[in-house]
Amino acid sequence: MGNMAKGYILSAHRSPADSKKRDAYTKLAIPALEDAGGKFLAKAAKVTPKENGINERTILIEFESYEKALAAYESEAYQKALKVLDGGADRDFRIFEGV
């Protein structure tokens, strides 16, 4: 039996976030995602955009599987963080399976 593909969350901001809302969200989101098994691989404020990319914050989080990444997003703890963010960030937010 082969190894299960890892799951990932990628959050790429399209524009600067509301700093107060982002800070309140971060205080809840980081522990919620880490408690769900997430490992932060990148929290990049330094970005070099290419091919229509945007020079904004990019986050990459790894999970044991796609299902665990999806469950982390849907968790009660993370949903509380999203409520605090309350539209304070315009992001391209994706949950995907690795190879």
Which functions belong to the PLM regions below?
Residues M1-R57, E64-L70, E74, E97-V99:
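Short S/T/G/P-rich N-terminal loop/turn motif that feeds into the first structured element of a domain
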